[in-house]
Design a protein with these regions (language model features):
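Hydrophobic ligand-binding cavity/cleft-lining segments
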Residues: 1-58, 193
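Short, surface-exposed coil-to-beta transition loops
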Residues: 4-6, 85-89, 111-116
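Generic structural detector for well-ordered beta-strands
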Residues: 8-12, 91, 118, 142
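Hydrophobic pocket/interface hotspot
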Residues: 18-22, 28, 72, 92, ...
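Glycine-rich portal/gate segments that line the openings of hydrophobic small-molecule binding cavities
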Residues: 40-107, 126-127, 181-183
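Substrate/cofactor-recognition hotspot
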Residues: 170
């Protein structure tokens, strides 16, 4: 059975910064709980299309980005103190600068997994009535469990709630990490796209 999960987060940062943060694969382990000890095991990068040139020089962000066709294998511990690591092989299937990108699982814990990240400019009013430019970040997951009825039971009892907790954690980490984002040389590659 196919399941969906959706999450939204408004961030007081411009689309260019938010998208660049999520398009940089080095940030993925930083968005996962520390107890998972997530790490990138392998990566084969495909360059994204040329980055649009922002009118505002402050938004001309130089950072690595994983374009459509990028394949990555990450591994992580499925629960605290786990002696095993779970490999997850995924590919960026679709990529459009400052709009969206989607990744699909080729090998991993799910029978099917597609995760689309999308951004759009959205201004909000603060407590003082001032208009703040920002970005609405949307995550949409489509996934299927393995192991038939047993997998569906696990989804009902554990997995659905765990996905919600992981995305709540991601939102907290995103809010903490975005103010620290500085374009810098990648540790994965010296090539900046």
């Amino acid at each position: 059975m196919r399941h969906t999960f959706e999450a939204e987060q408004w961030l007081p940062y411009r689309v260019e910064l938010v998208f660049a943060f999520f398009a940089n694969p080095e940030n993925l382990p930083r968005l996962m709980p520390a107890w998972q000890k997530a790490r990138i095991e392998e990566a084969s990068f495909a360059p994204p299309p040329p980055r649009p040139v922002a009118a505002d020089p402050a938004l001309r962000i130089r950072s690595i980005a994983a374009g459509a066709g990028t394949r990555m294998t990450i591994s992580f511990k499925p629960f605290p103190f786990s002696p095993i690591r779970v490999p997850w092989d995924a590919e960026i299937a679709d990529f459009a600068w400052n709009d969206h990108f989607c990744d699909v699982q080729h090998r991993g814990p799910f029978a099917y997994w597609k995760h689309c990240h999308s951004v759009r400019p959205e201004s909000r009013t603060n407590d003082r009535g001032e208009l703040i430019e920002g970005t609405l970040l949307r995550d949409r997951l489509e996934y299927e469990m393995r192991c038939g009825a047993v997998g569906e039971l696990a989804h009902t009892v554990v997995v659905r709630r765990q996905i919600g907790k992981i995305f709540a954690f991601r939102q907290q980490r995103t809010a903490a990490l975005l103010p620290l984002m500085r374009p810098q040389k990648s540790v994965l590659s010296s090539t900046e796209y």
